[in-house]
């Protein structure tokens, strides 16, 4: 078995690399404790959901580097990276995580702005006369 498990998770434009080693349950995101990095409780819970569901929150130390996007995309990317690391460590966790849809890369991306329009779908105000 590998000493360090290295995985990647993506969501929107965010990319998270997770390095998982056996430890005491510390989670560090961009050199900050996860409580400081994700100040919003919901985003923190979303990021740590794979650990909570598999009941392995106290077994591993996880160091995460995350870049790009906003807070929501980053927490989704962190969640996917952690879920992939857990399955690499223990295949039995795969079934649990798959039923919770935590191993699925969310394909939704921001739709591009089109020319002749205000945003991707919103049009400029139309005047009949």
From Swiss-Prot:
GO terms for molecular function: RNA binding; structural constituent of ribosome. Gene3D superfamilies: 3.30.230.10. GO terms for biological process: translation. SUPFAM superfamilies: Ribosomal protein S5 domain 2-like. It comes from the Bacteria. InterPro entries: Ribosomal_Su5_D2-typ_SF (IPR020568), Ribosomal_uS9 (IPR000754), Ribosomal_uS9_bac/plastid (IPR023035), Ribosomal_uS9_CS (IPR020574), Ribsml_uS5_D2-typ_fold_subgr (IPR014721). Pfam families: Ribosomal_S9. One of its GO terms (cellular component) is small ribosomal subunit. Keywords: Ribonucleoprotein, Ribosomal protein. Belongs to the universal ribosomal protein uS9 family. NCBIfam families: PRK00132.1. This is Small ribosomal subunit protein uS9. The lineage of its organism: Bacteria, Pseudomonadati, Chlorobiota, Chlorobiia, Chlorobiales. The gene is rpsI.
């Amino acid at each position: 078995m590998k000493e360090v498990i290295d995985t990647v998770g993506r969501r929107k434009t965010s990319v998270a690399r997770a390095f998982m080693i056996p430890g005491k349950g510390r989670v560090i995101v961009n050199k900050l404790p996860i409580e400081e990095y994700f100040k919003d409780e919901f985003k923190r819970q979303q990021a740590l959901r794979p650990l909570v569901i598999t009941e392995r929150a106290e077994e591993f130390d996880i160091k995460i580097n995350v870049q790009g996007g906003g807070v929501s995309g980053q927490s989704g990317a962190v969640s996917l990276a952690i879920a992939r690391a857990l399955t690499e460590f223990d295949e039995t966790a795969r079934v649990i995580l798959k039923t919770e849809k935590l191993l699925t890369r969310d394909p939704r991306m921001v739709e591009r702005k089109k020319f002749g329009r205000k945003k991707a779908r919103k049009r400029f105000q139309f005047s009949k006369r």
